[in-house]
Amino acid sequence: MAQKIQSVKGMNDLLPVKQKDFKLTAAFWQAFEDTVGRWTRAYGYQQIRTPIVEQTGLFVRSIGEETDVVGKEMYTFSDSNDSLSLSLRPEGTASCLRAVVEHNLLYNSPQKLWYMGPMFRRERPQKGRYRQFHQVGIEALGFEGPDIDAEIIAMSADLWEKLGIREYLTLEINSLGNREERAAHRAALVEYLTRYEDKLDEDSKRRLKTNPLRVLDTKNPDLQEICNAAPRLVDYLGEDSQNHYVRFKAMLDGLGIQYIENPRLVRGLDYYNQTVFEWTTDKLGAQATVCGGGRYDGLIEELGGKPAPSIGFAMGIERLLLLVSEYGSLEVNAAPDVYAMHQGEGADLQVMKYAQALRAQGFNVMQHSGYQSLKAQMKKADNSGARFALIVAQDELANGTVTLKDMNGAHGQQTVAAEDLTPTLQQWKNA
């Protein structure tokens, strides 16, 4: 027997049934996708779909060459034809903005776009963290004021309500100011951290040289006291940045959205400025961040477009749905409305015709394949979760009738004329 080929570690199959080490099903995932589609339409966002492979230079320029994502986590390879360096996308914002710039989508008006799809990072797989993971992203492009910052946070809070997990999520916010303010803070931070360099772990020493702001994001408990006493970026904000942040917080207050100000919240990508935020939970162990984002006012220009202030966020679907599956609510109905059975010569063709007619009227119908006893077929109908069973046997063929059974028992079992099949089932379904 040939050896089985396994999936790549950290990359999961999505099946009709739960797996031992991956509890999400395709039906649960589809129900979430349907919810996201309705949610984004309600806020006026249009979907965009981009390739999963991009030129590596896109991520070097946007995310930052010295970030962990670009430096350690991307899947990068050379195109065999022209040695062009390509990478599987590690996040969605850069790809979305590349498409916006390439196709000049901002030529006459701002854009509200959303995307959903797989991302790839070479990380150590664990619960809530995978090498292939999926994100939903929201990008509001060409909007400058703090009102859009507050709106997209309200938008995310609305989704948490729909999924029944709002009480399990905490909003953390911060302001990173503009480029000049960050540069002044960076100089003070480097001077401060250098005094403690002998106490820093190896990862923090590396970040001190490449991206010192990320040192403040360390999870090392031995460094918390040093980080807590470090210069705060908020103390380096100029008047414009302060006003933006104050107005943003006032809008959150007016919307009744509670938040925690976290001066050490910096996010892991270099393109952020001004408003940044994360939604976190204490229900998923170490993987606390479910959703995060912020402003990236200079990124479109960095990618070759005209300056356009913008803001966005992304949520990890696997992590979010693990939270929903344990604590939230999401209506999942993968079962068919009708299980169609047949018995005897000619009944298989007739039941196929009935099934097609029912599907044309909006019923989901699973038709039995093969030739088994009605008892065996009824057992399969029960296992399918169908609400109704449709039976066509020799008596029904001869009399031009069908037998219907309500699997929940409300309407019992009835034999009706074939022409009454659809209206009877519609009446039962709506009762």
From Swiss-Prot:
Highest taxon, organism lineage: Bacteria
Documented EC number(s): 6.1.1.21
PROSITE patterns according to UniProt: AA_TRNA_LIGASE_II
Cellular component aspect of the GO annotation: cytoplasm
InterPro entries recorded: aa-tRNA-synth_II, aa-tRNA-synth_II/BPL/LPL, Anticodon-bd, Anticodon-bd_dom_sf, His-tRNA-ligase, HisRS-like_core, HisRS/HisZ, HisRS_anticodon
Record GO terms (molecular function): ATP binding; histidine-tRNA ligase activity
Locations listed in the record: Cytoplasm
Signal sequence segment: none
Enzyme class (EC, first level): ligase
Primary location class: cytoplasm
Keywords of the record: Aminoacyl-tRNA synthetase, ATP-binding, Cytoplasm, Ligase, Nucleotide-binding, Protein biosynthesis
Reactions that this protein is recorded to catalyse: tRNA(His) + L-histidine + ATP = L-histidyl-tRNA(His) + AMP + diphosphate + H(+)
A GO biological-process term: histidyl-tRNA aminoacylation
Gene3D superfamilies noted in UniProt: Anticodon-binding domain (3.40.50.800), Bira Bifunctional Protein, Domain 2 (3.30.930.10)
Aminoacyl-tRNA synthetase in keyword set: yes
Family membership: Belongs to the class-II aminoacyl-tRNA synthetase family.
Assembly, per entry: Homodimer.
Protein name: Histidine--tRNA ligase
Organism name: Neisseria meningitidis serogroup B (strain ATCC BAA-335 / MC58)
Name of the gene encoding the protein in the UniProt record: hisS
